[in-house]
Amino acid sequence: MMSLSNKSIRNALEMKDENIIFTEDSKFMLVNGIKSLVYFAMLTKQIDRCLNCGLAGHLVKNGFNKNMIVAPSLSLRPTYISLKRQKYKCKSCNSIFVAKTSYVWEYCQIAQPVRQMILSETAFNTSLKDIGRRFNVSDKTVQRIIDEEAKMHKKSLPEHLPKHMAFDEFMSTDKMS
């Protein structure tokens, strides 16, 4: 029997980042007391310069950071990616940072396709709890995702009205109260 390739798994999880490599076969495991499908992956990148001081040639690999990422589910079973991100240390300024990917925002544990699916569900008359249950996140997380998206699209409004305003039509009533 042939196992799935990295490309097949990447397509199923809607992953475009080629720097994420699947390291072993997926397994069914208990995550937060629920039997879940877990994929195992590693993220490494060739980084030339320190993100803090900008010096080249002073970076050393410094182990991995392991996270459980909520991934798109192909069934009703929760799906996660156990992602090991490469850590780097700058010998010049002693700063430590982790490899980044567009698949998951920095300091976030939810994959971008899941965030997009959550946002698309909000267009329908569905409660936050139901959306959270469907995508294996809390209702508070759903609300936070909605708020973050709204903040990105919020246009800055002026604090004062303009000095001159024009009206096409104006209707007045005789009642003054």
Located regions from the model:
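Short, conserved DNA-binding cores of transcription-related domains
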Residues: M1-T101
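Short glycine/proline-enriched turns and hinge-like loops at secondary-structure junctions
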Residues: G33-I34, K175-S177
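Short, positively charged, Gly/Tyr-enriched micro-motifs
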Residues: M68-M176
